[in-house]
């Protein structure tokens, strides 16, 4: 597998320019760029600056993060989401960035949606977004979020949706923490049902050992520092033939307060150690 860094991991004290500098220094293969950080970068840099960096570097862009709350939008929400999505498509094309991560909707009211309502809406929306993305040559990586407030939580549910969409440019994100957050990865076998070519992105992260009903994204940890069965998950992916990105994505306030270079260095070293076990 190849190493990747998601901008979220050091975002409170960092920026895209710093992430690029240190990811290159510590020999990451890929970076996942956050759209908000890209927009901030473009206030003081140009796209040509960014394209020139990637042209000269071994570091390459992999997935833009993320288009969120795609389900059950009203007209105003849909318009706002589409504006960001089209921006992401344009940026992806210019940067030769192959994927955009898309995320289901979060809200307490999502708990009241039926399985069929979520399925039907997700299929419809992903097809519409796929139609928009196709001319730009970018693929959509649909990410289930394990927290009960999100409407698509499990790999089984996400894969059923993506399978029904049946587009070459729509696949899934395997995020270790999100799958653990759903049911402690007891459904790991569900990943076996997803064809290799439909696994677009792998987010590697770990978790504190606390009850699921209090677990939140702030409890993410560096790979190998927590209780997720990463060795088994990675072996499963390797057995399927997966050789692409293992991208460290963490939303831990403690890491956000650390020195940016230290976070990026540790992310590389710990990810590399886990994926080569």
Located regions from the model:
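Alpha-helix N-cap and loop-to-helix initiation/capping positions
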Residues: 41-45, 49, 76-84, 113-124, ...
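N-terminal substrate-binding region of glycoside hydrolase catalytic domains
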Residues: 22, 26-42, 65-70
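Active-site-proximal loop/turn and secondary-structure-junction residues that shape catalytic pockets
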Residues: 9-11, 35-37, 67-70, 104-108, ...
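Active-site acidic/histidine proton-transfer and metal-coordination neighborhood
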Residues: 15-17, 55-56, 73-171
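Glycine-rich, proline-tolerant flexible connector loops at the mouths of alpha/beta enzymes
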Residues: 32-54, 106-110
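Histidine-acidic metal/acid-base catalytic patches
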Residues: 1-4, 9-27, 96, 152-174, ...
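Conserved beta-strand positions in the central sheet of alpha/beta enzyme cores
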Residues: 32, 63, 101, 141, ...
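Catalytic-core regions built around general acid/base machinery
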Residues: 45-57, 125-132, 190, 194, ...
């Amino acid at each position: 597998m190849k190493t990747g860094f998601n901008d979220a991991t050091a975002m409170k004290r960092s920026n895209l320019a710093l992430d690029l500098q240190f990811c290159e220094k510590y020999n990451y293969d890929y970076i996942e760029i956050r759209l908000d950080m890209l927009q901030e970068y473009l206030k003081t840099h140009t796209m040509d600056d960014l394209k020139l960096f990637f042209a000269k570097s071994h570091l390459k862009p992999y997935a833009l993060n993320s288009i969120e709350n795609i389900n059950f939008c009203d007209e105003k929400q849909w318009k706002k989401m589409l504006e960001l999505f089209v921006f992401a498509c344009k940026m992806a094309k210019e940067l030769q960035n192959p994927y955009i991560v898309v995320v289901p909707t979060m809200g307490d009211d999502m708990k009241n949606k039926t399985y069929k309502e979520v399925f039907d809406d997700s299929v419809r929306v992903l097809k519409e977004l796929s139609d928009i993305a196709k001319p730009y040559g970018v693929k959509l990586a649909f990410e289930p979020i394990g927290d009960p407030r999100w409407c698509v939580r499990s790999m089984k549910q996400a894969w059923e949706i993506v399978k029904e969409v049946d587009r070459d440019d729509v696949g899934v994100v395997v995020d270790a923490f999100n799958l653990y957050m759903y049911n402690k990865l007891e459904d790991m076998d569900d990943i076996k049902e997803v064809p290799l070519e439909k696994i677009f992105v792998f987010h590697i992260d770990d978790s504190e050992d606390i009850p699921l009903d209090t677990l939140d994204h702030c409890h993410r940890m560096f790979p190998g520092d927590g209780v997720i069965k990463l060795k088994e998950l990675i072996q499963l992916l390797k057995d399927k033939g997966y050789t692409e990105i293992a991208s460290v994505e963490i939303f831990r306030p403690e890491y956000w307060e650390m020195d940016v270079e230290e976070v990026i260095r540790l992310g590389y070293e710990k990810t590399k150690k886990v994926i080569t076990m």
